[in-house]
């Protein structure tokens, strides 16, 4: 039996008998290899991915087929372009567009050795905007990506960013509830809270992954990390992360805080993100830079400019208003006894008295006001209930700050917890 794909992928000595020349390996996976390949016809470079189907489970075979099915339906400058595929002797060959500058993970990893620098704000913003445009296209075609991570963000010498690897992609139909999938998949560091809680999820899970990726681009590290999955789940569900570098504007950091919200109902869609004034302005700057870039084909520019123009001209959806700049409501007042989870290694719950008054959260040891600590509501990102499975206590709610810090409180009843969450949301102008 001859080697599979011998008439398609060969070596330099077989140029006249094959369509592509193997120019060297670029990656290894559990079930195969990826090669840089040169098309004999015109000398252009692409990537040839060869996978051994005989070693795969039924589920992994479905994921392999996804790498063909979904990119075939995608035609966008910020998504790796599918070229062709072949199957022979239990081997699958997929030929895809080649990105000549590696992937984003390779740009971030050197930071751990000290051999790297932070991205400048406009660089990080333009990376993020292109990924948003790719995800907007994917979601508009009723697809989920489900494996957004730095290793799947491919870079080119033209400045274009390409989202690749559709192995976990999923096609869906819109439903009344907006819930479309339940399969637990993707890379753990980027998984949304709803997946850790084994809940059904929708395109907001992709948005969470994009938020984790944006934090990684800005901070050169992941927002949530641990030595095991249980520890990672705990950190993701707690929703706390280290502040981003001061070199980035507060407006840009607020974008991260707005995305990394545990409740998907309070998390913006990609389209709603575009309505944030900072992002909206960034899109206009991106188009200006795009038009001046002589390394990008005019036909590619036209596609991106057309998409951005459509986004900028679209009306703000009713739901999007709650993701724009909020207005602190100084009239909201709420007081009551709570238990607060302390920090440090010996974490314990301690009785406290909490107040919302005149645009501030004030925490004291008792109702008499001893040992007061205040927090301006402008520094509060949101509040949400914490499931019993996570908190191991009833009636717990979390308060998240703009800087990424979190505080957990235990109310005296379920109704009291709901009143606290609603009062905080009213106070910060999102309810």
Curated annotation (Swiss-Prot):
Keywords: ATP-binding, Kinase, Nucleotide-binding, Serine/threonine-protein kinase, Transferase. It comes from the Eukaryota. Residues 331-429 form the PH domain. ATP binds at residues 26-34, 49. GO terms for molecular function: ATP binding; protein serine kinase activity; protein serine/threonine kinase activity. The active site is at 147 (proton acceptor). Its EC number is 2.7.11.1. The keyword ATP-binding applies. SMART domains: PH, S_TKc. Transmembrane segments: none annotated. Residues 20-279 form the Protein kinase domain. It catalyses: L-seryl-[protein] + ATP = O-phospho-L-seryl-[protein] + ADP + H(+); L-threonyl-[protein] + ATP = O-phospho-L-threonyl-[protein] + ADP + H(+). It is an enzyme of class 2 (transferase). Belongs to the protein kinase superfamily. Ser/Thr protein kinase family. This is Putative serine/threonine-protein kinase B. It comes from Trypanosoma brucei brucei.
């Amino acid at each position: 039996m001859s080697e599979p794909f011998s008439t398609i992928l060969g070596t330099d000595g077989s140029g006249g008998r094959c369509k592509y020349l193997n120019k060297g390996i670029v990656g290894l996976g559990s079930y195969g290899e990826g090669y840089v390949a040169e098309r004999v016809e015109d000398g252009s470079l692409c990537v040839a991915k060869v996978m051994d189907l005989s070693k795969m489970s039924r589920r992994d075979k479905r994921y392999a087929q996804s790498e063909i099915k979904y990119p075939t339906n995608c035609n966008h400058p910020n998504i790796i372009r599918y070229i062709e595929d072949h199957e022979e002797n239990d081997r699958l060959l997929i030929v895809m567009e080649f990105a000549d500058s590696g992937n984003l993970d390779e740009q971030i990893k050197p930071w751990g050795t000290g051999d790297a620098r932070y991205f400048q704000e406009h660089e990080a913003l333009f990376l993020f905007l292109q990924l948003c445009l790719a995800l907007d296209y994917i979601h508009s075609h009723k697809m989920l990506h489900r494996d957004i991570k730095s290793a799947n963000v491919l870079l080119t010498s033209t400045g274009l960013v390409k989202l690749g690897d559709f192995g976990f992609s999923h096609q869906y139909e819109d439903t009344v509830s907006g819930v479309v999938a339940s399969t637990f998949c993707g890379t753990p560091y980027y998984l949304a809270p709803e997946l850790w809680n084994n809940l059904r999820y929708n395109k907001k899970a992709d948005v969470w992954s994009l938020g984790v990726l944006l934090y990684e681009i800005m901070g050169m590290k992941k927002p949530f990390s641990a030595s095991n999955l249980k520890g990672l789940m705990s950190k993701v569900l707690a929703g706390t992360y280290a502040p981003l570098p001061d070199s980035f504007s507060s407006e840009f950091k607020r974008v991260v805080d707005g995305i990394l919200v545990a409740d998907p109902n309070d998390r913006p869609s990609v389209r709603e993100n575009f309505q944030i004034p900072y992002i909206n302005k960034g899109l206009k700057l991106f188009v200006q830079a795009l038009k001046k870039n002589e390394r990008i084909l005019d036909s590619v520019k036209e596609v991106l400019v057309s998409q951005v123009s459509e986004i900028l001209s679209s009306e703000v959806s009713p739901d999007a208003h709650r993701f724009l700049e909020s207005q602190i409501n100084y009239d909201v007042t709420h007081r009551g006894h709570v238990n607060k989870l302390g920090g440090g290694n010996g974490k314990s719950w301690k009785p406290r008295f909490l107040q919302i008054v005149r645009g501030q959260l004030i925490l004291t040891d008792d109702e008499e006001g001893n040992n007061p600590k205040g927090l301006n509501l402008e520094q509060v990102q949101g509040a949400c209930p914490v499931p019993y499975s996570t908190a191991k206590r009833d009636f717990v709610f979390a308060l998240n700050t703009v800087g990424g810090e979190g505080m957990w409180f235990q109310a005296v009843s379920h109704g009291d917890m709901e009143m606290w969450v609603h009062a905080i949301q009213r106070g910060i102008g999102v309810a």
